[in-house]
């Protein structure tokens, strides 16, 4: 099992090219099941989750090709993936595949919409709370599906097809909104979504579906309208830049100090996070090329943060920002409102010398003068990168174990940081 070794104390200088967004790429890939024609996605990041989803789609009969690295390309060069679901060969998504990645459960919507039936295992993935699929199933039931759950599988049927409906989400749900957009695009009639998620990745999916022939109005707003169509066609679409990756590297620069251009990053996708990082002491400017992040020797300031749906502070940057606050001059409170059990990184940050105490859904971080390198263990995707950020500013060597979590969501992280001066290396095959 790979590990990542980091020696702290180096500032970051240079350029980091921001990859395509994982959280956009996965539902876009799943949308290929909605049509028998070819969907081409550009700027797809090279990640373990992307590769796993390709396996799952292949199981259902999707033919795909991937333009990988070519000689002379940057190691983080984007990929184009061509997906053709000419014939769906299996409406069942088995446990051994779905259990490895929760987002793969979303195949239930296009399979049901196109084939009238789907049987999908209940999901796995990061161990962050329960992440119930109830809201996704509520969407399908509202659209006319009959749902049965038995032996760990969800069996959804709509033999006469789905029909439009008014769906009011009891709380904002990204997965539920993705599900509704895909299923309602092939449903008969009009669908109205109330309290829909507004995340940029939702807008990206809606834009792609529109290119495929869907009729969607209002994506990115809390009320969305979908007029169902009889069929969807192929299309080409470029995945939007990863706002979580951009925010992560912005926090890394704020932590380590230095001057880095986040090439291709779009500020309007993460403005709340950028404002918060700036309050903590970084200097941020938007250029034609991306986002420039700087911090000189000035100390970090404590900032209270509460996670919230877009356009609020992203839950997927909570762990990274907590790592930053471990070095702030004073006390900060970080409140998690999206997921339960998303403080698993606290114990590992404490191994580096962080002072953090938990009070319900809040973490109180008392900044310390010095962090000290130590062996630590990644527990999930975002927690793992928070340990890397802390290690950049720690004295001595930190060894991050279980980095397969990092590979699920960060493309060539050690190469990108290493090019900016970090002392970081991957050690392969070590238990």
From Swiss-Prot:
Keywords: Cell cycle, Cell division, Cell shape, Cell wall biogenesis/degradation, Cytoplasm, Peptidoglycan synthesis, Pyruvate, Transferase. Phosphoenolpyruvate binds at residues 22-23. It is found in: Cytoplasm. Its main location: cytoplasm. InterPro entries: Enolpyruvate_Tfrase_dom, Enolpyruvate_Tfrase_sf, MurA_subfamily, RNA3'P_cycl/enolpyr_Trfase_a/b, UDP_GlcNAc_COvinyl_MurA. It catalyses: phosphoenolpyruvate + UDP-N-acetyl-alpha-D-glucosamine = UDP-N-acetyl-3-O-(1-carboxyvinyl)-alpha-D-glucosamine + phosphate. GO terms for cellular component: cytoplasm. The active site is at 126 (proton donor). It is an enzyme of class 2 (transferase). GO terms for biological process: cell division; cell wall organization; peptidoglycan biosynthetic process; regulation of cell shape; UDP-N-acetylgalactosamine biosynthetic process. GO terms for molecular function: UDP-N-acetylglucosamine 1-carboxyvinyltransferase activity. The modification 2-(S-cysteinyl)pyruvic acid O-phosphothioketal is found at residue 126. Pathway: Cell wall biogenesis; peptidoglycan biosynthesis. Belongs to the EPSP synthase family. MurA subfamily. PANTHER family: UDP-N-ACETYLGLUCOSAMINE 1-CARBOXYVINYLTRANSFERASE (PTHR43783:SF1). This is UDP-N-acetylglucosamine 1-carboxyvinyltransferase. It comes from Beijerinckia indica subsp. indica (strain ATCC 9039 / DSM 1715 / NCIMB 8712).
């Amino acid at each position: 099992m790979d590990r990542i070794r980091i020696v702290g104390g180096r500032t970051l200088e240079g350029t980091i090219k921001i990859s395509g967004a994982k959280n956009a790429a996965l539902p876009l890939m799943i949308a290929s099941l909605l049509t028998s024609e070819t969907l081409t996605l550009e700027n797809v990041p090279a990640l373990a989750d992307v590769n796993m989803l390709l396996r799952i789609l292949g199981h259902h009969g999707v033919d795909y090709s991937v333009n990988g690295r070519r000689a002379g390309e940057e190691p983080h060069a984007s990929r184009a993936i061509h997906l053709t679901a000419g014939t769906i060969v299996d409406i069942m998504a088995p446990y051994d595949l779905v259990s490895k990645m929760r987002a793969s459960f979303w195949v239930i919507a296009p399979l049901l919409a196109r084939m009238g039936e789907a049987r999908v295992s209940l999901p796995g993935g990061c161990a962050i709370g329960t992440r119930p699929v109830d809201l996704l199933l509520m969407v399908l039931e509202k659209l006319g599906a009959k749902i049965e759950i038995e032996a760990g599988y969800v069996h959804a049927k709509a033999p006469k097809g789905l029909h439009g409906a008014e769906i009011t989400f009891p709380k904002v749900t990204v997965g539920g909104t993705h599900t509704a957009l895909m299923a309602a695009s092939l449903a008969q009639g009009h669908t109205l979504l109330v309290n829909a998620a507004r995340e940029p990745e939702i807008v990206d999916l809606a834009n792609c579906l529109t290119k495929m022939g869907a009729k969607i109005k209002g994506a990115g707003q809390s009320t969305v309208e979908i007029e169902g169509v009889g069929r969807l066609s192929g299309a080409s679409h470029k995945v939007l830049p990863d706002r979580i990756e951009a925010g992560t590297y912005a926090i890394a620069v704020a932590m380590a100090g230095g001057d880095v251009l986040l090439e291709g990053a779009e500020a309007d996708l993460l403005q709340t996070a950028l404002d918060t990082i700036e309050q903590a002491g970084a200097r941020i400017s938007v250029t034609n090329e991306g986002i420039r992040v700087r911090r000189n020797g000035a100390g970090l300031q404590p900032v209270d943060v509460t996670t919230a749906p877009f356009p609020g502070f992203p839950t997927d940057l909570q762990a990274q920002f907590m790592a930053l606050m471990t070095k702030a001059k004073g006390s900060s409170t970080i409140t998690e409102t999206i997921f339960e059990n998303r403080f698993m990184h606290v114990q590992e940050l404490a191994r580096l010398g962080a002072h953090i105490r938990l009070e319900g859904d809040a973490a109180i971080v008392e900044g310390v003068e010095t962090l000290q390198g130590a062996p630590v263990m990644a527990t999930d995707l975002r927690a793992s990168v928070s340990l890397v950020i802390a290690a950049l500013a720690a004295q001595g060597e930190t060894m991050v174990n279980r980095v397969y979590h990092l590979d699920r969501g960060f493309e060539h992280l050690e190469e990108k940081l290493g090019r900016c001066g970090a002392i970081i290396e991957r050690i392969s095959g070590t238990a």
